[in-house]
A protein has these predicted regions:
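Extracytoplasmic
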Residues: 13-18, 31, 37-39, 43-47, ...
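Active-site-adjacent helix/loop patches that line small-molecule binding or acyl-intermediate pockets
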Residues: 15, 70-150, 158-163
């Protein structure tokens, strides 16, 4: 991380604007993890959709939701195309809440308790220092969504850490998220084609960790980007057989496309040197 901080010093990349967690999966039964500021909260942008994906599969597995074509379409659009509208629809299904006009105080309390259903699920699994109860907004919250923002600081936004995100992605990769079958279904949605001619430079497969990958690499990922942050949560398989989860969060450098690939490149070089 020192190298990345030094390289991007002219861009005023500060130590508190970068967080990274790396999980070596050479032996999936004995993963080795290292992190830099891995427990620090950051607004996750669309990386939060990874948590909603797992929650949807848990609800389906438990019979809390009916598996419909529309639900499947929304899951696909949330992960593959990162659509906020699809995510909002799934948050409604997960929590039994909807956006809309302001509510009376007692109704708002009930609404907010229901909205925290996903938080309670991840807390039951031992996840800490995260908040997963907000829809990703395009223009901002209104009505009861804004009511809940005002009443719930410091949890007025979604929050994740790179450690928590890496843990979840690792569980998906190793078939431990909900079930092996459901983890495999999640992996299908997260699969990217990092080859140069497979899409535009701005999509999730080409504008983040993928920029550092050598030919022949395989990538599964969920990126997040908005005005104040740029993140990527990636699982990579290199041509030499090395496998790792790499989660990189950057804050206040949303338009700096080179920071995440620079971190990934250092990791790739280290893992590529292995025999």
């Amino acid at each position: 991380m020192d190298g990345a901080l030094e390289r991007f010093a002219p861009l005023k990349l500060e130590t508190n604007q970068l967080a990274v967690t790396l999980v070596d999966l050479r032996d999936p039964e004995q993963p080795v993890q290292a992190s830099y500021r891995g427990g620090e909260q950051a607004y996750p942008a669309s990386v939060i959709k990874l948590f909603y994906l797992v929650a949807i599969h848990r609800w389906l597995e438990d019979g809390k939701l009916e598996e419909t074509a529309e639900l499947r379409r929304a899951m696909r659009d949330m992960i593959v195309d990162s659509l906020n509208g699809a995510t909002g629809y799934l948050v409604d299904l997960l929590t039994g809440t909807t956006s809309g006009p302001e509510l009376a105080p007692n109704e708002m309390e009930k609404w907010y308790y229901q909205r925290n259903a996903v938080n309670r699920y991840f807390a039951s699994l031992g996840y800490t220092n995260i908040n997963v109860n907000r829809k990703p907004w395009c223009e901002g919250p209104y009505g009861r969504e804004m009511q809940s923002v005002r009443m719930s600081k410091p949890n007025h936004r979604n929050w994740l850490t790179t450690d928590a995100t890496a843990r979840l992605l690792n569980e998906i990769v190793t078939g431990k998220a909900v079930s092996a079958r459901r983890s495999a279904e999640m992996m299908e949605l997260l699969k990217r084609d990092p080859s140069p001619d497979s899409g535009t430079k701005n999509d999730q497969a080409h504008a983040y960790t993928a920029l550092a990958l050598p030919p022949g690499s395989k990538l599964w990922s969920k990126a997040g980007w908005m005005s104040e942050c740029r993140h990527d949560a990636a699982y990579v398989e290199l041509p030499n057989g090395s496998k790792f989860v790499l989660v990189t969060f950057t804050v206040d450098h949303a338009n700096e496309r080179e920071i995440i690939p620079a971190v990934a490149k250092a990791v790739v070089q280290e893992f590529s040197a292995r025999k």
